[in-house]
């Protein structure tokens, strides 16, 4: 079995919103515009979230992923090859992050998102305090637990979801801010 590819050097920060740090069932919309002067032959995005994420680039769904490992204090990192989703000029990465502090207290991780995009060894973007974030009020809480050992029931209000927030044409309003809780990445597993 081969070791998965990691970035040459890990940059960026874990980002989140202070008002949701102690909220055990929360959603955060995150986005970052960036410019690609030339789309390289291979552009990679590494991403991790506690607890889960859905990833979009230029309005297209790229993937979803990990739940931070609960027992050993580490976080999983997903690798997405994203060249296909990029365009020359302005691009946007958008991530919906869900955090759930398990009822039994197993999830000791702080909520957050970390990501880093690079091409040909050059960093294109990473998660930091320049991103735009908005509480996911369209995912209504509090929600009922399905059962003692299962997750929460779903309750989504599409009227409160910002239209086209995953696309470059979207213009954030005053409900968007910068993440006010950032933590250095350091070594994965030290969260």
Segment roles from a protein language model:
Residues 18-28, 66-75:
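Extracellular beta-rich ligand/substrate-recognition surface
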Residues 24-36, 75-82:
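Short beta-strands within extracellular/lumenal beta-sheet-rich domains
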Residues 27, 38, 46-48, 73-75, ...:
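Short solvent-exposed loop/turn micro-motifs enriched in small/polar/acidic residues
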């Amino acid at each position: 079995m081969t070791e998965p590819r990691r970035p040459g050097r890990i940059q960026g920060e874990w980002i989140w919103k202070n008002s949701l740090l102690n909220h055990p069932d929360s959603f955060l919309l995150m986005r970052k515009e960036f410019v690609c002067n030339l789309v390289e032959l291979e552009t990679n995005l590494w991403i991790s979230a506690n607890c889960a994420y859905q990833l979009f680039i230029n309005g297209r769904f790229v993937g979803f992923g990990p739940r931070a490992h609960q027992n050993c204090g580490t976080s999983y990192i997903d690798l997405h090859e994203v060249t296909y989703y990029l365009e020359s000029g302005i691009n946007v990465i958008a991530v919906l992050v869900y955090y759930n502090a398990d009822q039994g207290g197993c999830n000791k991780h702080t909520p957050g998102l970390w990501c880093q995009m690079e091409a040909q060894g050059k960093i294109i973007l990473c998660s930091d305090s320049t991103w735009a974030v908005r509480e996911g009020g369209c995912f209504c809480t509090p929600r009922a637990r399905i059962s003692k050992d299962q997750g929460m029931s779903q309750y989504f209000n599409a009227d409160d979801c910002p239209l086209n927030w995953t696309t470059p044409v979207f213009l954030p309003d005053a409900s968007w801010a910068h993440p006010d809780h950032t933590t250095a990445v350091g070594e994965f597993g030290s969260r």
